[in-house]
Amino acid sequence: MSGSTGERSFADIITSIRYWVIHSITIPSLFIAGWLFVSTGLAYDVFGSPRPNEYFTESRQGIPLITGRFDPLEQLDEFSRSF
């Protein structure tokens, strides 16, 4: 067995009261922060993804599918104009 590095063992850490005091606050806080991030719609704004009611508009009900092999840029321009 090699020498000690001076670090506490994992069993010592998870059985300490200090560990559970810290983590009983931080783990629920992270869960609540994530839930608020998604439920308020901020996640849609930060990552730029459309909200569920914005995928299909009144003017564009079809799927934006590239079908032309030789003119994909024209189709992309047409799709981007409809946004």
From Swiss-Prot:
Set out the biological process GO terms recorded for this chain's protein.
Answer: photosynthetic electron transport chain
Q: Which GO terms describe its cellular component?
A: chloroplast thylakoid membrane; photosystem II reaction center
Database matches in PROSITE patterns: CYTOCHROME_B559 (PS00537)
**What do mutants without this gene show?**
Plants unable to grow photoautotrophically, no detectable PSII activity although under low light (10 umol photons/m(2)/s) on a carbon source plants are green.
What the entry lists under InterPro entries is as follows: PSII_cyt_b559_asu, PSII_cyt_b559_asu_sf, PSII_cyt_b559_CS, PSII_cyt_b559_N, PSII_cytb559_asu_lum
- Domain of life, per UniProt, equals Eukaryota
The record's subcellular location field reads: Plastid, Chloroplast thylakoid membrane
Keywords attached to this Swiss-Prot or TrEMBL record, sorted alphabetically, are: Chloroplast, Electron transport, Heme, Iron, Membrane, Metal-binding, Photosynthesis, Photosystem II, Plastid, Thylakoid, Transmembrane, Transmembrane helix, Transport
The cofactor note from the UniProt entry for this protein is: With its partner (PsbF) binds heme. PSII binds additional chlorophylls, carotenoids and specific lipids.
Pfam (any one): Cytochrom_B559a
Q: What is its main location?
A: plastid
Q: Which residues cross the membrane?
A: 21-35
Positions with a binding annotation for heme? 23
The cofactor named in the record is: heme b
How does the entry describe its membrane topology? Single-pass membrane protein
Molecular-function GO term, any one: iron ion binding
Q: What does this protein do?
A: This b-type cytochrome is tightly associated with the reaction center of photosystem II (PSII), and is essential for PSII function. PSII is a light-driven water:plastoquinone oxidoreductase that uses light energy to abstract electrons from H(2)O, generating O(2) and a proton gradient subsequently used for ATP formation. It consists of a core antenna complex that captures photons, and an electron transfer chain that converts photonic excitation into a charge separation.
Matches recorded under HAMAP family: PSII_PsbE
Q: Which family does it belong to?
A: Belongs to the PsbE/PsbF family.
Subunit (UniProt): Heterodimer of an alpha subunit and a beta subunit. PSII is composed of 1 copy each of membrane proteins PsbA, PsbB, PsbC, PsbD, PsbE, PsbF, PsbH, PsbI, PsbJ, PsbK, PsbL, PsbM, PsbT, PsbX, PsbY, PsbZ, Psb30/Ycf12, at least 3 peripheral proteins of the oxygen-evolving complex and a large number of cofactors. It forms dimeric complexes.
Could you identify this protein by its name?
Cytochrome b559 subunit alpha
Which organism does this sequence originate in?
Nicotiana tabacum
